[in-house]
Amino acid sequence: MNQERVFKVLLGPHVSEKATVLAEKKGQFVFKVATDATKLEIKKAVEGLFNVKVENVSTVNVLGKTKRTARGLGKRNDWKKAIVSLQPGQDLDFSSSAE
């Protein structure tokens, strides 16, 4: 997979209360990914970008919420979430990948 596709697959970390608990207790990290990304692409992107070994990737398609505005109903975009499990002994540090 080329370097350009790696940056298009991983859109960024998803920070939430549940994601923080998963990272601390189970060593699982949550990313916002492209809607057309496959599990294999996500695995290769995380391994290549952060130099870690990935054990498992689970994906969830999150439906956008319907919101009311002054002009009627609107809808937020659908997006895809990936929960990445690392092999035992591996840890992910977001600050070191920016080098």
Swiss-Prot record:
It holds the Pfam family Ribosomal_L23. GO terms for biological process: translation. One of its GO terms (cellular component) is ribonucleoprotein complex. The keyword Ribonucleoprotein applies. GO terms for molecular function: rRNA binding; structural constituent of ribosome. Keywords: Ribonucleoprotein, Ribosomal protein, RNA-binding, rRNA-binding. Gene3D superfamilies: 3.30.70.330. InterPro entries: Nucleotide-bd_a/b_plait_sf, Ribosomal_uL23-like, Ribosomal_uL23/eL15/eS24_sf. It comes from the Bacteria. Part of the 50S ribosomal subunit. Contacts protein L29, and trigger factor when it is bound to the ribosome. Belongs to the universal ribosomal protein uL23 family. One of the early assembly proteins it binds 23S rRNA. One of the proteins that surrounds the polypeptide exit tunnel on the outside of the ribosome. Forms the main docking site for trigger factor binding to the ribosome. This is Large ribosomal subunit protein uL23. It comes from Pseudomonas putida (strain ATCC 47054 / DSM 6125 / CFBP 8728 / NCIMB 11950 / KT2440).
